[in-house]
C-alpha cells in the first residue's frame, strides 16, 4: 500500500471555480474561495493501510476529516453542506469517496485521491458532471 502521509503543496488546479459554480456557489463567494484555495496547506496522516486524517487549511477555512476505508463518516461537501461519505480503494494507489447529502437537494458529489508513480497526489472532485483536478507534491 502507498503512504499518503505528508505535507502537500499544490502545483496545479483545473476547473475549481467551475465546480463551485455547479454547486450553486454565488460569484462573490467563488472569487473568495478560488483566491483562498490557490495555496492550500494539506496535511495527511495515514495509520496502517486504512485509517486517515486529512487537514486542509486556507486563509478562509480549515477542514479536518478522520476516516477509515470502508466505514461511513460525516464531513462537509466542498461548499460546506453536511454529508455522509464512504471511502473505498479503487486501486492500490487510489481511494474514491462517494458523498450523500444529509439534508436537501444538490448535485451528486464525490472525490478521489491518487498517488502517482512520480510522487504526485491527484485530488479529483466532482459535482454532477463537472470535474475539478488539483495536483500536489510533498513539501
From Swiss-Prot:
It comes from Rattus norvegicus. Transports retinoic acid to the nucleus. Regulates the access of retinoic acid to the nuclear retinoic acid receptors. The gene is Crabp2. Disulfide bonds: none annotated. GO terms for biological process: embryonic forelimb morphogenesis; fatty acid transport; lipid transport; positive regulation of collateral sprouting; retinoic acid biosynthetic process; retinoic acid metabolic process. Transmembrane segments: none annotated. This is Cellular retinoic acid-binding protein 2. All-trans-retinoate binds at residues 134-136. One of its GO terms (cellular component) is endoplasmic reticulum. Forms a beta-barrel structure that accommodates hydrophobic ligands in its interior. Belongs to the calycin superfamily. Fatty-acid binding protein (FABP) family. Interacts with importin alpha, RXR and RARA. There is a cross-link at residue 103 (Glycyl lysine isopeptide (Lys-Gly) (interchain with G-Cter in SUMO)). Its main location: cytoplasm.
Amino acid at each position: 500500500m502507498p503512504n499518503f502521509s505528508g505535507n502537500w503543496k499544490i502545483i496545479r488546479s483545473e476547473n475549481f471555480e467551475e465546480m463551485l459554480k455547479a454547486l450553486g456557489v454565488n460569484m462573490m463567494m467563488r472569487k473568495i474561495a478560488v483566491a483562498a484555495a490557490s495555496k492550500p496547506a494539506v496535511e495527511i496522516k495515514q495509520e496502517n493501510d486504512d485509517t486517515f486524517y486529512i487537514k486542509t487549511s486556507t486563509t478562509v477555512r480549515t477542514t479536518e476529516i478522520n476516516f477509515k476505508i470502508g466505514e461511513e463518516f460525516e464531513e462537509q461537501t466542498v461548499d460546506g453542506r453536511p454529508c455522509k461519505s464512504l471511502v473505498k480503494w479503487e486501486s492500490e494507489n487510489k481511494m474514491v469517496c462517494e458523498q450523500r447529502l444529509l439534508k436537501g437537494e444538490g448535485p451528486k458529489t464525490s472525490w478521489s485521491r491518487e498517488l502517482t508513480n512520480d510522487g504526485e497526489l491527484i485530488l479529483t472532485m466532482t459535482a454532477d458532471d463537472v470535474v475539478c483536478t488539483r495536483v500536489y507534491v510533498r513539501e
